[in-house]
Amino acid sequence: LAVLGSVAMYLPTFGYFASAMFFLAGLGVLRTLWLPLLEISPTVLKLGCIAYLPFLLLELILEEHQIYSVVQLVATAITGLGLLVFTLGTATWLYGKFEKHEIVDFWIYKYSRHPQYLGFILWSYGLLIYVGYKDYIRGAFRVPPTLIWLITTMIAIGVALHEEIEMKKKYGKKYEEYCRKTPFMIPLPKPIVNTITAPLKLLLKEHPRSMKDIIVTTVLYTVILITLSYMLILALKL
């Protein structure tokens, strides 16, 4: 399943992002796996376009020639930040295992329980922004794979939730105490956290405690984000 997922989603997405002269750009040929989706509707890959909302709002206040330079700068910064967070997370985890810590809860793990997944999401988001605001040659396939990015991100979050369940089984209250002190991915104000988790609390009343709960959670938020994206497409005629 992991291999099939990589071939169908991760590798073609990376190929989409790669520059024309980049040695891995040939991975873009795997985008042909998405053609059945395009047969359903040419805009199906836009069903994750809610990810572009901050930049769509920028278009309302900036002129067209300003948009591209600002967005490219932001995309570069987010991509670089993602690589930094991922590298720090990996280095911290390896050091913790080398020192035989049961729970890695220091350095960057004091601020995020899953910095490696966070780094991947930020890195891929930066690249998603980049391909959405770049010049294409005439006739190029120019629909950013926002739906694929959304699904990939939700898979990463689902894996992180599964790891938390396993850690709680293994370390019990010790890991639960760490969870109370450290945010899941990003430190956010409590009102924002409550807003984000409101749909989950309505459905499950508590955090996911089984694989079934994880599937319900990831499907729920995926459906919500796809619905919001569809509403955005209709409203802005994307």
Identify what each model region corresponds to.
Residues 1-106, 118-238:
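Membrane-anchoring alpha-helices and their flanking helix-loop junctions
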